[in-house]
């Protein structure tokens, strides 16, 4: 159960914290209804992806969530409170994972000028 995105990058949206439109934060453009088909143009978006990742990292959310997930990936309100992790931190963490995939795709495929993926709504 859950919503997935697939294409040049693949993953699962974090349950209850990440919207299907998370890719738009990193320059993805919706292509079709039903599922959301996205394209990210390297020339237009790579710099923005790097900057957005840096902004997310500067909030400390990624570090806080990584610390919480150090021993296991299970979490609840009590565990989040113990580690000082907010719902917004979880959302930032989830979006960071997607943005990192986009950056890594372009870094690992230097000849590619665009990246495609389909997100479940």
Describe the role of every protein-language-model region.
Residues 115:
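Conserved GNAT acetyl-CoA-binding A-motif
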